[in-house]
Design a protein with these regions (language model features):
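Solvent-exposed, non-transmembrane loop/terminal regulatory segments of multi-pass membrane proteins
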Residues: 39-75, 363-401, 515-523, 765-771, ...
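Juxtamembrane segments of multi-pass membrane proteins
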Residues: 51, 67-73, 81, 344-469
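Structural signature of multi-pass, alpha-helical inner-membrane proteins
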Residues: 2-28, 35-41, 54, 59, ...
Length: 856
């Protein structure tokens, strides 16, 4: 291969192959860096973080996190004990340091059918060490009992998921090695492929820190999906190298293979990238997170295939030659023949199935809460949750955040909510009982407060005077303090402040009583009141997710709107999160479906240069999507909405590659044989690629679905595996018939893009030229001509064509034509005689002919 005759792509391939040791060194540095940088990645485990900023849940959670303290809690059920034994355990639990309260009584909400339920509250948040240690002590105290614990305290779901994914990756690696061995042409190709994608995976994990914070979904499934989605790229280059290596040496074969594979692989990756890019347009920002991380994974896989794998192929070339083996995958000629025989039967049946499944998929029951999703593998926490739910029911709590300061309005709102049959209980400062039937927000005058607190009236009067001065209410002092009323909660906090400053000293027994009271009031303040907001805690008799629940959330807003500006009222909880997600799902679903299909159609339009073929391919893959999401409807099993959005985009962006590879082979083979024969041969040629990619993606999805306890990740895996298998079935059992029947449509809607190839082409010897060219020949030619050029030619082929011919072909064609100034078809070097053949004979447009140097 002459250096001056190389195309730009061949020059790039030559540089990569010849500088492979430099690339090895760069990858070593990058891998060392990424090994350490993987620990820099921040992983977000709370999916509500990705809710749009304008949603009520996101606004409310921001206020709650900034203004209030939420103490850790646990629901603990102990079965097969008597009520008396249950009371004994309550005292035992409450004696543990770090446990604030263990609610238990004889009501059906706490004791039923020999099972006791304790609602435990800790002295710290769910992540505080005091709560974690107390939870550990509770487990030890209940060891030996039939106990079920549902809590977030001391539970590291991220670590559990990471451990599960490590096991999944190991098993997936074994499956991938087995599949690659079946589809390889040499056993030594397998370590090359594994090394290439091992490097790509580590590079992706090591660069995730550039995204700032990524979701636990992206962090857990990206590695497996990266391998499954991008393994084709390495296989294409590997097979190209194998083909080129038959007549060429390893270096030349690698250069030729890489120069041909780069455009082929790049175009193949566009459909996958476009499908993933559609996720970025979701209102739910988890889509942008997944899109960013997965597209980065695909791009790094491409980089590894283009720059690392050629060097590995050169390194392993001798071993690849020695370990070659026969094809292990069988031909699927029988399937191809069956497709041809059923070409008039399957398509009509498919159209009917398409219509039915489109309706079923539209009726797919979606869910927006993952608490009730069941997984094939259950964690102890999930088992406990289901056990407690089946015995005592599931708790559904929402927090109502309102402006603080108006205790009367708060009390009225609480009373209104408690009177609703949908409410189990409602709690706020305005309805928490203190002493003598007073609530914490009851307004007391000095005499009432002195009697309640057990202090002298004079001390209480001084305290009220100081409070009035501190609150700039001097008029109350002038009017007299007997009628001056201050909410009990505010006055106790003011009393505490004055005692801490040393302005008031009480008797020791009263001091101890008030200290205990102050501790309880401080906890209540941290949980329920700040300077700007108050928080009401409402327990509902409704499921976490239902239309009735969503309607009642609107009722809460209407009631709160009677006392407060509704723009300053926020209802926060799992139910509101589900409502916000359901509100945006319809729009996100439509957006992703349209964008992913549109992106893919545009790419296919320019790939196949046909308007009909992309529509047929999209129809088949869309059919696989509808069939996939008909299963939840038929099984009456709710589907987590995020599973639909993610799998929909992956199926449209990645599974369509299976249809593309069959169509590409069919279109090429159709030039050499009849459509029926072409489709059979196309299936045989495409099957190894489809088998490799499809089996890995389906296997990876099945592993994720069956081996993780995280309901979101599991749901994605199950849908992805099922969707991939359906896609494979349709492209092998339906698409061939459609291609054969629709052959006329494909041909009639085909088009060619007129373009100028600006890449100079070089020829030496006798060259046939048909068209308009511009460049250096031997002489100056500008105009229309149809003939031959003798000598060296380097020119742009503006229109028409040019090709080298043999002496014999030249003489044979020359004898049948008459060229000006030529009598004898004799070819010789420049400087010929009068009766020699002309030195420059071309077909096309030419002008300005000279005898020495020709610029065309």
């Amino acid at each position: 291969m002459k250096e001056q005759n190389l195309t730009p792509m061949e020059k790039l391939a030559t540089f990569i192959v010849d500088k492979r040791n430099l690339f090895f060194l760069l990858y070593i540095f990058a891998l060392v860096f990424c090994f350490f940088s993987t620990g820099w990645v921040n992983v977000e485990n709370d999916i509500t973080t990705y809710l749009p900023e304008e949603t009520e849940t996101r606004k409310g959670l921001t206020i709650m996190n900034e203004e209030f303290v939420t103490y850790g809690s646990a629901r603990v059920m102990v079965s097969n004990i008597s009520f008396a034994h249950g009371e004994m355990l309550k005292e035992k639990i409450e004696s543990i340091e770090g446990v604030s309260e263990a609610a238990f009584d004889s009501s059906a909400g706490h004791y039923i059918n020999s099972s006791a339920l304790y609602d435990i509250t800790f002295d710290g948040t769910a992540s505080d060490e005091i709560s974690v240690h107390a939870m550990h002590e509770v487990k030890e105290a209940l060891a030996g009992y039939d106990v079920y614990i549902n809590t977030e305290v001391g539970v590291d779901s991220a670590a559990d998921l990471k451990q599960e994914m490590q096991v999944i990756i190991v098993i997936a690696a074994v499956i991938i090695v087995a599949v690659l061995t079946l589809t390889s042409r040499s056993y030594a190709e397998v370590p090359v492929l594994i090394a290439t994608f091992g490097v790509a995976a580590l590079l992706n994990m090591g660069t995730n820190f550039l995204c700032g914070t990524i979701s636990f979904i992206s962090n857990s499934v990206t590695v497996v999906l990266q391998l499954a989605l991008a393994i084709d790229y390495a296989i294409i280059l590997c097979h190209r190298f194998s083909d080129e290596h038959e007549p060429l040496e390893a270096r030349e074969a690698c250069i030729a293979a890489l120069s041909k594979a780069i455009p082929e692989i790049s175009s193949s990756s566009l459909t996958t990238i476009s499908g993933l890019a559609a996720l970025a347009f979701m209102h739910f920002k988890i889509g942008l997170d997944l899109s960013t991380v997965l597209i980065k994974a695909i791009l790094l896989s491409l980089l590894s295939v283009f720059t690392l794998m050629p060097g590995l192929l050169m390194l392993f070339s001798k071993l690849i030659d020695k370990t070659g083996h026969r094809k292990l995958l069988p031909q699927i000629t029988l399937i191809g023949r069956f497709d041809v025989l059923t070409r008039y039967i399957i398509p009509p049946v498919f159209v009917v199935i398409l219509g039915v499944t489109a309706v079923w998929a539209n009726k797919c029951p979606y869910c927006y809460s993952f608490t009730d999703l069941t997984t094939a593998k259950q964690s102890e926490s999930q088992i406990a949750y289901q056990k407690i739910k089946n015995t005592f029911g599931a708790g559904n709590m929402v927090a109502v955040i309102i402006p603080s300061g108006n205790y009367r309005a708060e009390a009225s709102l609480l009373q209104s909510l408690e009177s609703a049959p949908e409410v189990k209980s409602a709690m706020g400062l305005a309805n928490i009982r203190a002493m003598d039937d007073y609530t914490l927000t009851s307004a007391l005058n000095p005499r009432q407060f002195s009697e309640l607190a057990g202090i002298e009236y004079e001390v209480a009067s001084l305290l009220y005077s100081a409070y009035a001065v501190n609150d700039d209410q001097y008029g109350q002092i002038l009017k007299g303090l007997d009628q001056y009323q201050v909410p009990l909660f505010d006055m106790f906090l003011f009393l505490k402040e004055q005692m801490e400053r040393g302005n008031i000293t009480l008797e020791e027994d009263i001091q101890e009583t008030l200290d205990d009271l102050f501790d309880q009031l401080e906890k209540a303040r941290l949980q329920l009141k700040t300077d700007s907001y108050s928080r009401l805690v409402v327990y509902l008799n409704l499921p976490e997710e239902s239309q009735e629940t969503f309607d009642f959330l609107k009722f809460i807003h209407r009631e709160a709107g009677r006392y407060y500006d509704d723009n300053n009222v926020y209802v926060v909880g799992n139910s509101t999160s589900d409502y916000d997600l359901s509100s945006s799902f319809g729009q996100d679903n439509l957006l992703i479906s349209i964008l992913s299909a549109l992106f893919v159609i545009v790419i296919l339009l320019f790939t196949f240069k046909s308007a009909g073929l992309p529509v047929l391919l999209i129809l088949v893959i869309q059919g696989s999507i509808w069939i996939n999401f008909s299963f939840p409807y038929l099984q009456s099993s709710p589907l987590y909405f995020l599973s639909y959005l993610i799998v929909n985009s992956i199926q449209m962006g990645a599974n369509i590659d299976y249809a593309i590879v069959i169509s590409s082979h069919y279109k090429d083979l159709k030039k050499e044989m009849r459509p029926k024969q072409a489709i059979v041969e196309a299936l045989n040629e495409a099957f190894p690629t489809i088998f490799t990619s499809g089996s890995i993606l389906a296997g990876a999805g099945a592993l994720i679905g069956q081996m993780t306890t995280n309901p979101i990740i599991s749901a994605i895996g199950v849908c992805l595996s099922r969707g991939t298998l359906i896609s494979i079935g349709l492209v092998l059992g339906v698409l061939p018939q459609i291609l054969v029947l629709g052959d006329q449509i494909i041909e009639r809607t085909s088009f060619e893009l007129n373009h100028i190839n600006l890449t100079p082409k070089s020829f030496s010897g006798v060259t046939r030229v048909q068209g308009r060219i511009r460049g250096n020949v031997n002489g100056i030619v500008e105009g229309s001509f149809d003939g031959f050029i003798r000598g060296d030619m380097e020119a742009l082929i503006i229109s028409g064509k040019a090709s080298a011919v043999t002496e014999e072909s030249f003489k044979a064609e020359y004898q049948g034509k008459s060229y000006a100034g030529a009598d004898t078809p004799t070819l010789s070097d420049s400087g010929g005689k009068e009766n020699q053949a002309p030195e420059n004979i071309v077909k096309g447009e030419s002008a300005n002919e000279q005898t020495n140097k020709t610029n065309i």
